[in-house]
């Protein structure tokens, strides 16, 4: 024990604790022939230190108690992906012009299907600031036989429809249409002359429609139409009025705005059969129509001009607004010549209110 204490308290004081432990456990260690005594008996300090290290396990590899830093997750094994269901291609909504003239594949109807053409409306009340009495002078008589006058308030209505009779013409690029429009002016409140129809104009026509796809002044050019139209009031002289025209119409669109440009040429008639030789100088030689659609409503402005210095023609404004489903409210304002065929050379301003049904223009 004296040797062990001398060694432990010699040049290495750091082993006092170890030495004290050995001293307190000496009886047991000596009885068990403890290896600590063997290390204590080593004279060389370096070798003695190595001996104690071996006993303490210092020469074993250090064990890292800290978890290893997480690395990237292992790459997933490739697996067969389930088949992705096909998503149907969502097409853009057809424009009003496409629907009216079937300019795209998804808008086409069968031939011989009756469809809207011009606006169909009924105005129970239409007021005129000037009434054309001249053509009817002597035509209407009251109950006492005296000549009666037309009233400045009457009703007006129009029916119109079109039908495609052939498709895929001329290199599969044209459709042939027939159309009919009828407009009536009814002196419904004029009981003095038995509430007659003052004027009814009949307008059948036939035309080819060619779809187009090009840009023009920021507009999408959608179609070109070539047609012939007859318009008459079905009366005999002196009230007969009629004319025949050929026309070209160009349809343009830009957003909610549609523009139709329609020049025409009157087919000449013989002087003996022409009831209204100067009709082009009043009703005009062409028409420009702009339509703006918004919130299921539309405003249409139609301008006609004779393309002469005196600038005769007309302007018409139509306002259509929704009431219930296909039933719409309708307001019409007209100013100029030709509000009807019998009035082709008579100027007046009119305004009327009523209802419109279905789609048109």
Segments predicted by a language model, with ranges:
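N-terminal secretory signal peptides that target proteins for export/translocation
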Residues: 1-11
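Long, repeat-rich segments with strong aromatic
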Residues: 287-330, 334-340
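Membrane-spanning beta-strand positions in outer-membrane beta-barrel proteins
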Residues: 48, 170, 258, 298-300, ...
């Amino acid at each position: 024990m004296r040797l062990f204490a001398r060694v432990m308290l010699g040049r290495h004081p750091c082993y006092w604790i170890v030495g004290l432990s050995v001293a307190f456990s000496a009886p047991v260690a000596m009885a068990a022939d403890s290896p600590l005594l063997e290390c204590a008996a080593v004279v060389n300090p370096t070798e003695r230190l190595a001996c104690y290290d071996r006993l303490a396990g210092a020469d074993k590899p250090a064990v890292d108690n800290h978890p290893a830093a997480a690395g990237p997750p292992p790459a997933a094994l490739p697996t067969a992906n389930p088949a992705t269901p096909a998503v149907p291609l969502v097409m853009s909504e057809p424009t009003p012009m496409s629907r009216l003239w079937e300019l795209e594949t998804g808008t086409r109807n069968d031939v011989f299907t009756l469809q809207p053409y011009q606006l169909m409306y009924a105005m129970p009340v239409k007021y005129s600031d000037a009434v054309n009495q001249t053509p009817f002078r002597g035509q209407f008589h009251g109950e006492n036989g005296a000549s009666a006058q037309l009233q400045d308030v009457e009703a007006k209505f129009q029916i119109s429809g079109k039908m495609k009779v052939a498709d895929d013409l001329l290199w599969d690029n044209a459709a042939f249409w027939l159309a009919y429009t009828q407009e009536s002016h009814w002196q419904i409140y004029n009981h003095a002359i038995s509430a007659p129809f003052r004027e009814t104009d009949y307008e059948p026509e036939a035309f080819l429609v060619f779809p187009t796809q090009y840009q023009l002044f920021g507009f999408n050019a959608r179609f070109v139409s070539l047609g012939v139209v007859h318009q008459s009031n079905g009366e005999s002289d002196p009230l007969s009025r009629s004319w025949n025209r050929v026309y070209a119409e160009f349809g343009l669109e830009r957003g909610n705005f549609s523009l139709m440009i329609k020049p025409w040429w009157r087919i000449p008639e013989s002087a003996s059969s022409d009831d209204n030789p100067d009709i082009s100088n009043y009703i005009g030689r062409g028409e420009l129509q702009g339509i703006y659609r918004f919130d299921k409503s539309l405003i249409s402005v139609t301008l006609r001009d004779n393309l002469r210095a005196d600038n005769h023609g007309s302007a018409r404004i139509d306002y259509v607004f929704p009431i219930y489903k296909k039933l719409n409210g309708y307001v019409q304002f007209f100013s100029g010549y030709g509000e009807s065929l019998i009035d082709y050379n008579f100027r007046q301003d009119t305004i009327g209110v009523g209802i419109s049904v279905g789609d048109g223009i």
